[in-house]
Amino acid sequence: METIGRNDACWCGSGKKYKKCHCHFDEKLKELQQEGHIIPSHDMIKTPEQIEKIKESGKINIAVLDYVAEHIKAGVTTQQIDDWVYEQTTSRGAIPAPLNYEGFPKSVCTSVNDQVCHGIPSEDVVLQEGDIINVDVSTIYHGYFSDSSRMFCIGEVSEEKKKLVDVTKECVEIGLENVKPWALLGDMGHAVHMHAVENGYTVVKEIGGHGVGLQFHEDPYVSYVSEPGTGMVMAPGMMFTIEPMVNMGTDEFYVDKVDEWQIYTEDGKPSAQWEVQVLVTEDGYELIAY
């Protein structure tokens, strides 16, 4: 951690003297580091100005998912969902973050039934009664990023699938309950994992949450198969996603060999995921996108 004089300008760019801004914050982090904890770097801490701009992006992300929620039904193709997302995002002066990201060809990820994540929208994928689908929307607005996803049950779904969707949402809610300043990401991830396991499910180990806001994917990586007492300290100003991928069967998966994007459960059983973008605050958390 860089050394700054107490009367110097604070590293956060507020224009305030360090002693009246982040001095106590850094002292708290240093104390936790000396106790053996992993602490965030300054570039993981969003400034108040950045937070306000990211919130504007988040509002668009929420509005786009709200539109999808109003229109999704049996008979809709996942390509139609992609069209909606593109139109609803660009009409608000924003850009779909997935489009052309590392070669991803579409504006949204649409993962149906046994697709764990990164489902590519297609005219050939027609939603059927009984399907479950994750729609993962990410937005760039004036250079600031937001990211969240929701599950949708198409018509009447089986009790098994409905329970998976509901428990996965509960996992995210439990994650939020464990977002507290100076607490550990590992404790939060462990609580999420345990709720899934207690309901007979598995959680994908290799894919987790991530920092977001100034870039699409930032540090820290947030595991949802973690041990208590481990992981980075959650400090006010940190922003990341809570997005466990919960499987009805095995946690093993495979990647489509043709497109190298779409991920499926190894046993063909359903997978579910809800995603929220959260800001750590002085007294808990604030939802940025959901």
Spell out what each predicted region is.
Residues 1:
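Conserved N-terminal segment of EGF-like repeats
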Residues 5-8, 14-290:
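Active-site neighborhoods and metal-handling regions in enzymes and metal-associated proteins
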